[in-house]
């Protein structure tokens, strides 16, 4: 067995509190209602989980429910009944959580005590706080919501919690807002002091208007009060009540709140099944304060401890290693496409404020699959590469064999494939958390990988429970500390994101304990050191990966979220910060992607662990009048017992049970209306693995794995330029520059550069000016032409005639006049940018000559030859023929490996250089002399300004990159090959003379 680089840690155990063997079987829904109405434990579970459904059932029992609502009631109650016995995922009073450990021998008995961890329902609490912020605003202190940011003359919030219909809100950035915002930026300020600050500027006669404006900021959460401090993390009943008591002179809230606290304490000591009346009492008291769908949240905590043995630990670590290695096959994701857009717009030498970056107009918007909010422009789906063609063939071959032989798909044979894959490609995973169900097959205990598999966000599963007991606090801290230590070694500051979701109904899953150095809060605040949203800048590091920096402290940050909220529901900015911090390639499992379109997938196993149970898709179109549901599932050879699955939600069904078949039929009908499918999954015996009081329980575990092999000390003490303001960097049309986007298909761009660009260059030269161009795609291919001369309007009139001719000849389809956003940071500042632009202009004069040379049938020059040798000449000019300096540069920027064998090409290029044929045709061209002069001017300027060597290299790299863009187009892989070949070429020239 290959040694794992992941070490399994103590794990979370989640199990049902009811024994599945005690579950009754029913043939009619009336039997269900009759039974559950006598089951005090289930009734209390239901009253907590869904108070409205509990009330509807009471109406039915009293004969007061309308007939059309009865069927829905029956089905809902039946599903909850099944859940109470058969699902172990944490939810209310249905299941409990404990900590398990690895030891010499396994032990599956739960012998500890179960306690209730009770919190106020977060939606109820937040709504109450918002109400009190209005009622007691004059007695409270306020701070600025960190979700606010200024953009132009408006103040936006990254999302809103006031309306599920809106993705963002904004108000005008006024002098009054500026005064209040700056006053409340770093701490809580009393209401009276805020008003006083405004009236000091405008006079007492504006007091009433100031209070009205301040009230609107509070209602719309531009300001948040001290009541919100630590609501989502480290919440304390006593601290909260002390704050309320200080402002509630009429005792409107404090008396009932203290009564609620007392009732909750009493309820926490009552056995489950005996607490219905006390629970109703709590609901009654809380509803009089504020009505809501739910009132309290409960997680059951057990001090039991089960054990897995050494062999099981090794088996799980083996699985973690295999799953971790699958990330090596991921070559391109949506974030890689986003990175390319970032580099094209900003280069790699500047940091961009995250709020500007995500703006669809002034930035580049959000990555393709981000939806909160959606980009307000259309874009086609970017290409991705999650696995190789070789992998695809392996998986398909295994699938065919398994289906043909009615066998499982065994992934053991792929282990060596992933182990060998790109040995120099290091995985960036700091660790994993895997979700596993416990089951039994052929009298043997087995693990089944959960439907949501897991994640690489260590602490994500334990954060919600971390404040419920000292043991769980310590457990969570141990997991988080492993990440903290690694980040500290890399000089990275960790930051926990704490936020209210857009829909505060989901806020119950947002609880966590803060165990990191800093916090990024949205729509809430904490007692910890906080990072301001507006101080977060995004850049590209030396490995071409995204990073985030706090511009006020220069710290490189990584962001984590250890609540259980679905990341696809995060606002775009938060999701991005979270995903780039995790380098989130884990979870793109090749078998899921390759098999996802199949209607049947056999069981997948690895080292006797079930990676994925057998699955069947049932489409609505599969059902017809000639075949019953039972006949349909029999025709697909679906077993007698199975699950109907939706994400991590699954319901056990049996073909023998008529009520189960009704649930299945109802689900198929619903999917038919959506023109969708339902997924069925094979059933495993899971009822008697873990025992409590001599009775079995359904259970699952969450096992964290911490990487044991250090990823190395990769400190990030690099410096990037802060992006210059829009006002200084952007040139409006006909203001110094004229910027044209000429939309031309890729296959006709060279024709335009050969036949039309020289004429445009003559027009500009006659007006004492110059121009340069770039090739681009966003998303349509075009040539970007930037022109500078004494009379841009006159030049435009003449250029327009040439463009008309190119359009008449069907070369150019259309063109735009745009704003020139100068890449000031990329080229070291305004002075060196101007000198770089001179290089671009000289280079743009050479390109038509190079294309002519390539096109000329009288020689055998190929585009690869010309691109290599002109790059060679560029390097010779920049480094004044010093090969050692050239090699130092190439060692930094060149890739370490390419697929092509370049040995023969090196010999070919060396011969070409000796013949010097290329030099005769290009090197002595007057335009090349102009280019050499421009390069020399830039080089001397960089020396005069004492640029760091890293900065010099970066500017040279950028200049060569845009030259290659002009000559060969957007070919990043080819550019890597060019650099690699040049490195080999200069090594040969220097050391093999």
Swiss-Prot record:
InterPro entries: Lant_deHydtase_N, Thiopep_bacteriocin_synth_dom
GO cellular component: a single term: plasma membrane
Alphabetical keyword list: Cell membrane, Membrane, Transmembrane, Transmembrane helix, Transport
Pfam families reported in the protein's UniProt record: Lant_dehydr_C, Lant_dehydr_N
Subcellular location: Cell membrane
TM ranges: 838-851
Membrane topology: Single-pass membrane protein
Entry similarity comment: To B.subtilis SpaB and S.epidermidis EpiB.
Functional description taken from the UniProt entry: Involved in the post-translational modification of the lantibiotic nisin.
Annotated NCBIfam families: thiopep_ocin (TIGR03891)
Protein name: Nisin biosynthesis protein NisB
Source species: Lactococcus lactis subsp. lactis
